[in-house]
C-alpha cells in the first residue's frame, strides 16, 4: 500500500509536495491512524481511519474514511467526517483554521502555509478522539 500511496503523491505533479505536507500533519496529529487510497470516480483520494458509514439513501453500511485528502483543480481538500454534538467539526472551527474555505466537512485551501497548522492538528486529534470514544455522529447525519 505504501508504494501505491507514493505513486498517488507522484501522480499529483506539482501538488504532490503540498499533499505530502498535509499528510505529514495528519499522521503527526494521529500517529496510529491507518492510511489507504479510496476510489472516487476516475481518481482516488487518500483516506485515514476507516469507520462504518451508511448514507441515508443506502440500505447497507459501508466503510468510509474519517479524514480524506484530495487534490482538486485549484485547491486541496481535506474532508473531516466528524460530527460532535450535532455540529460538523470542520464547519464549527472554520474561522480558526486560517485562510480556508469550509463546507460542512470539507476544508479547502491552496497551500498549507495558509492554514493554522496547530488548529488543524487539534481538529484532526479531536475527530479521531471523538470517533474512538463513540461520539462521532457523522453516520447519523
Model-predicted segments: where are they?
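Charge-dense, helix-prone N-terminal extensions
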Residues: 1-141
Amino acid at each position: 500500500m505504501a508504494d501505491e500511496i507514493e505513486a498517488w503523491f507522484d501522480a499529483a505533479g506539482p501538488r504532490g509536495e503540498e499533499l505530502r505536507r498535509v499528510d505529514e500533519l495528519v499522521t503527526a496529529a494521529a500517529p496510529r491512524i491507518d492510511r489507504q487510497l479510496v476510489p472516487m470516480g476516475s481518481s482516488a483520494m487518500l483516506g485515514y481511519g476507516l469507520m462504518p458509514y451508511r448514507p441515508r439513501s443506502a440500505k447497507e453500511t459501508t466503510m468510509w474514511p474519517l479524514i480524506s485528502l484530495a487534490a482538486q483543480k485549484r485547491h486541496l481538500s481535506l474532508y473531516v467526517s466528524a460530527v460532535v454534538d450535532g455540529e460538523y467539526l470542520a464547519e464549527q472551527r472554520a474561522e480558526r483554521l486560517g485562510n480556508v474555505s469550509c463546507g460542512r466537512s470539507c476544508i479547502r485551501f491552496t497551500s498549507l502555509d495558509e492554514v493554522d497548522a496547530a488548529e488543524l492538528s487539534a481538529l484532526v486529534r479531536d475527530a479521531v478522539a471523538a470517533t474512538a470514544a463513540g461520539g462521532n455522529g457523522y453516520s447519523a447525519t
